[in-house]
Amino acid sequence: MFFAYGEKEITYLKQKDKRLAEIIDKIGMIEREVDTDLFSAVIHHIIGQQISTKAQATIWKRMKDQYGIINADTILSAGVSNLQSLGITFKKAGYITDFARKVKDRTFDIDGIWKKSDEEAIKELSSLQGIGVWTAKMILLFCMQRPNVLSFGDLAIQRGMRMVYHHRKIDRKLFEKYRRRLSPYCSVASLYFWAVAGGAIPGMKDFAPKKQKKP
């Protein structure tokens, strides 16, 4: 399953932002996979922190092969040591089992997250061990498919914005200017900023000042 968007969102963004309109026309529709199972999405994002996408995919495949369905029962039955054997660090395995325990004993209302506003959902998710604000926002986008997520703390988003809008730096004030312009479809804009940052359009440059080499 891919992040759902279509003509309505594209038309709105292109009308609001000429430079982004050019990017959208060049790239076309973007397919980004989503995981609509909130429990497994939280675990998947914890695993992926500070490792490559390839390493994350390898560990995730091992986990799926080993346990099949990823839920609180299978995680708690596995325990920290078995999770470590899959290539997960001790600290992350602790975060994962703590999350599973909270879901199991209902001290974390995982179903209730879906009913909350973006701000409330981010606050709830980032109260979990191992989940910061940036990770919570990624869960909102790539699991819950919330339509208006744009993260200032995402370095690739900042890079993409510099490349699209020809800025040397994206400070908070500039970021908020674009966020307001692209709202309520910031999530779709995020997909294009990530694509640009990743080199989807050859020849586009990053306008960030080059770092001075130390003598």
Across the structure, where does each feature detected by a protein language model lie?
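Short alpha-helical scaffolding segments that buttress acidic/His motifs in well-ordered protein cores
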Residues: 42-47, 96-100, 139, 189-193
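N-terminal alpha-helical segment
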Residues: 39-43, 56, 76-79, 118-121, ...
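Short amphipathic alpha-helical interaction patches enriched in hydrophobic/aromatic residues
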Residues: 46, 79, 83, 107, ...
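Residue-level marker of regulatory loop/turn positions in helix-turn-helix DNA-binding domains and
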Residues: 36, 40, 114, 149
